[in-house]
């Protein structure tokens, strides 16, 4: 994937200023689940080596066709938007394939040009639903248990404050339990086929080890 920048704004000197939207995707996991919103960029802009990326942004990505077909493309369980690109990348890492960031490649992209036209409450609900689905597909064992405990704690706190978004998202998640089960089964079948299985925590450790000697900033 490329570095993604906003369309230019004009500064006081009337020169084009491009804000960086996305860099390489930085892995971040905790008992609260998998975070997909962190990016990192090398401080040395002349660096020419590819950098490992947690996943590839759906805004721009060059993907091996054969591997994409084996992965089954984007999982439609995330329709209409959000988390489908993160899911595809994590599935690729799970079976031993890698995602890379090319620091010299640049893509200009207007962020959320379509989604910004939709009602914000609906967007928030879909994001929360897909976040729950994503974590329930990719977390295992005690990590999944802690995530769901934290989820219900957040839900209760939000309900006390009069916000029912997480509760509604949980209901939508429960409606998709069968599809989630099928998505997990397909991933495990592909892992058996490739004879490899790496958890999100294995992927996080691998990426952090690879970039250990590189100076970078997280945003």
Task: Give the residues covered by each predicted segment.
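Acidic/His-rich active-site region of diverse nucleotide-sugar glycosyltransferases
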Residues: 1-73, 77-80, 95
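Short beta-strand segments
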Residues: 1-4, 101, 148
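Short glycine/proline- and charge-enriched loop/turn segments
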Residues: 44-47, 71-72, 108-118
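Conserved active-site beta-strand element of glycosyltransferases/polysaccharide synthases
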Residues: 62, 80-83, 89, 98-103, ...
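Short, hydrophobic alpha-helical packing/hinge segments within bilobed ligand-binding/sensory domains
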Residues: 88-89, 131
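Catalytic core of nucleotide-sugar-dependent glycosyltransferases
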Residues: 99, 117-143, 164-180
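Non-catalytic, C-terminal membrane-associated alpha-helical segments of glycosyltransferases
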Residues: 143-219
